Structure formats: structure tokens, C-alpha cells
């Protein structure tokens, strides 16, 4: 494994093309694009190096933002995630070594580096690496079309992008039916896809509302999230009963008091009957 992922000369040799951070780094913007005056590395330059470096190069080249809460699935191909897990496993081995944890003789730490890598890529941050779930829309234009409010309760698992601590909670998604309807399970799938990445609860509520509006063409959408945060429970203030609530209201949910009241009345009813 060490040999396979040995540092590539592109990044460590003065005789080869070099990665130029001031042209391709975090300060790259549309106002300062990469120019042909700089010798740009092609994809073949990365064939023997780290795949993660190649993907990062392409995103910087395209001025594609790749923050902890951004989806980057357009830059991944079949088999890429497994190779990225291999590379992250190697990096986690270094982290464990720096923490002075004996990975060789401690039976509980053997394989931990790979378990961490798989957990990040396949579970906690899977929403970054997977395309948005398919949400087939059906026309809502028959004579007896539904024009009322729909409220869906979705359980969420997310991760705080500051300390990489778990966030667990519930989202209540309200929508006034428009011209398109999606399956009930799709609301939860979309919400969970938005949640499984590094994010803030305030951003997550906005993300869910935006994706629901896009999938349904609805303009009247409400999202209410209540969650507990590991960064408050496991560190810092150690507040084990801490609860955070965020609300995003679009269209009539924001401008019409009766719609807003109906939404929160529905939430209260669901909370009263929800499993405990």
C-alpha cells in the first residue's frame, strides 16, 4: 500500500511540473482565472499519484467550490470512492500515529484508520460524494388535484463542519402542493442527502428548502429542524440537554399567518404522536 501511494514526483521534484498554489489555490476566482501562460498539469500527470490531488486540481482549475458542505459527485467516477478511501486510510494512519496510538498491537485500533475513512466517505459525509437521489415528479393537474398542505417528518444525521461532531435530529418539511408531486419517501431522501456532509444547521435548513423547491417547482415551502449537536454535548460547554431549532419559511409559509400557523400546528401534532 505504501508503495502504491508513494508521493508522486509531480509534487516533490524540482525537475517536473509543479502545482502552483497561488494560481490554483483557495484564492482562485472568476476574476483571476488560470491562464495558458502557466504550464498546467494534464490528467496523465496524476496517473501515478494521489487521486485526491487530481480531483482537487480539477476543481480548482474549474473554480469549483469544495467546502465541507458542497457536493462534488460530478468529479467522481466509478471506483474513485474506493481509491479515495484507500488514500484517506493512509492519512488516518498518520493521524493515529501522531496521537501516539499503537495501531500494531492494540487490538481495538487495528484497522481503525480504514474504518474512519469508510465512515466518512460512505456514511457521515456520503452526501458530498453521491449524486442527488432520484425524485421522480408526477403531475398534480387532475380535476381532483390536491391543493392542501403536506408535512413530512424526516430523521436526520449530519456532522458539524467545525469539529466534525455528530448532529442528530428531525426535520419537518411542509409544502403546499403545486403542479408537481414527488413520493413521500423522497422528501426524507433529499433531506438526508443534504444532511450527510459537514454543515451548519442554519445552512442545512436552507439547503433542504432549496432542493425541495427545485424537485417540486413549489414556491411555498417550510422547513423546521430541531437537533442536538455533539460539539455542544461532547466538548466545550458539555450541555447534554442542548437543543437547537432552525426555521426556513418560503412563500406563503412566510407571508401568510394562517399558513404559518397550520404548519406549526401540524408539527406539534406530529411531535405528540412521534415515537419516543
Functional labels for PLM-detected ranges:
Residues 1-3:
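Compositionally biased intrinsically disordered regions enriched in polar/charged residues
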Residues 5-276:
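A domain-level signal for the structural core that forms small-molecule/cofactor-binding pockets
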Amino acid at each position: 500500500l505504501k508503495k502504491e501511494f508513494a508521493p508522486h514526483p509531480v509534487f516533490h521534484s524540482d525537475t517536473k511540473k509543479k502545482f502552483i498554489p497561488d494560481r490554483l489555490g483557495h484564492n482562485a476566482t472568476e476574476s483571476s482565472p488560470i491562464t495558458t501562460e502557466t504550464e498546467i498539469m494534464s490528467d496523465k500527470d496524476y496517473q501515478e499519484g494521489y487521486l485526491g490531488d487530481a480531483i482537487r486540481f480539477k476543481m480548482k482549475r474549474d473554480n469549483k467550490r469544495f467546502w465541507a458542505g458542497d457536493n462534488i459527485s460530478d468529479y467522481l467516477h466509478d471506483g474513485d470512492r474506493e481509491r479515495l478511501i484507500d488514500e484517506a486510510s493512509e492519512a488516518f494512519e498518520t493521524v493515529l500515529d501522531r496521537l501516539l496510538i499503537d495501531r500494531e498491537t492494540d487490538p481495538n485500533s487495528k484497522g481503525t484508520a480504514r474504518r474512519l475513512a469508510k465512515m466518512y466517505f460512505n456514511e457521515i459525509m456520503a452526501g458530498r460524494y453521491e449524486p442527488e437521489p432520484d425524485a421522480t415528479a408526477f403531475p398534480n393537474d387532475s380535476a381532483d388535484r390536491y391543493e392542501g398542505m403536506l408535512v413530512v417528518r424526516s430523521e436526520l444525521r449530519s456532522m458539524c463542519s467545525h469539529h466534525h461532531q455528530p448532529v442528530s435530529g428531525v426535520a419537518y418539511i411542509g409544502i403546499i402542493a403545486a403542479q408537481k408531486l414527488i413520493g413521500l419517501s423522497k422528501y426524507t431522501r433529499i433531506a438526508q442527502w443534504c444532511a450527510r456532509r459537514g454543515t451548519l444547521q442554519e445552512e442545512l435548513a436552507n439547503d433542504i428548502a432549496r432542493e425541495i423547491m427545485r424537485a417540486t417547482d413549489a414556491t411555498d415551502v417550510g422547513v423546521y429542524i430541531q437537533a442536538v449537536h455533539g460539539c455542544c454535548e461532547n466538548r466545550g460547554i458539555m450541555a447534554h440537554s442542548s437543543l437547537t431549532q432552525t426555521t426556513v419559511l418560503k412563500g406563503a409559509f412566510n407571508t401568510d399567518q394562517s399558513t404559518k400557523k397550520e404548519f406549526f400546528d401540524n408539527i406539534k401534532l406530529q411531535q405528540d404522536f412521534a415515537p419516543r
